Amino acid sequence: MNNKHQALPEHELLTHKSFIRNLNLFDWAFALLIAIGAFIAQTQAGLHMDIYEMVILWASAGIAVFLGWFFKPMRWFIPLGVCLAYLAVDLYGGDIKHADGFLLKYLLSSQSAIMWQCAMIFAALFAYACGSLLAAHKKSQTNTLLGIGTAFGWISALAGFTGLLVRWHESYLLLGDAGHIPVSNLYEVFILFLVISSLMYWYYETRFTVQRLGVFVYTLMAGIVCFVLWYSLARNAQQIQPLIPALQSWWMKIHVPANFIGYGAFCMAAMLGVAQLMVIRSTEKGKASRLPDSATIEEIMYKAIAVGFLFFTIATILGALWAKAAWGGYWSWDPKEVWALVVWLNYATWLHLRLVVGWRGKILAWWAIIGLFITAFAFVGVNMFLSGLHSYGGL
């Protein structure tokens, strides 16, 4: 292999040599483990699943395998989260009354796991902030505190992932056949958002070695945690409720997660935009910035927006198909649909200006930041201030 290929990140080598041939024994063992897990899940819950849910189960297993092959740390993250959730299921023993047991009450019930997720996000932010200050003082790119911040971020994602899986099981314990995937209200989807954001940042931090950007990403995530806590207290949103008729569809299981991969990527890009503006400002003043260089930050921001745009596009298409099944038409110019289109056009334009026109620097950073407010209004603001077919998601 020539030097050009050696310099490429691992996943970019896919275009130069066979992806399958580069898989090792651990990769195939991971794939087998996921397949066995999916088979056990279908065996135990198959009587309660229709054909669409079985397709979603095996598609999810395939996605999990690809994630583990593409980003190696996922090979332990996914099995560990599933094992912790399965332990919680076993501790429940089919009866929600067992929630008072020590492990469930303080660690593994959905509420306990999610509270640990929230606590670890604040801990990660504190560690990243202290680590960034220490790195600036010692003029280094990494240190123990930044590593601790990364570890806390991993734990937060694992706790949130486990909490969502356990909450799914708890919904069946509480509601019987009316149990459902935990993406039915703002509380649940924000927990999903936090998990996705943590994992996405984890990937980019690992690939680009940019631990000092963690303070920007986790500042936004900590703000969202504050909102989740307020929302839980104000609306008792942590309580599991039956699905309203409009959400009783298998489309929800794929539309909502795809949407929140997009939201997570867009929000991360906005915080990277803030970091890039700080670097540009320091450069313009002739000062050395302690953050990664502007080009590196912009490259991560671009990749985040590209991934977010892809999944947001998929989610929008899935939403149109769901609308056809639910309301008889693919598009009705409902406020939520209109603002989804605004979000899509905003990031389509951003990508066009960067890839085709060749724009770089400050203007794209500002655009990404403004995009956060557009995305936030499309998700939360529309529900608060406008009415329409999607009003069931209101605050």
Label the predicted regions.
Residues 283-295:
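Juxtamembrane inter-helical linkers in multi-pass membrane proteins
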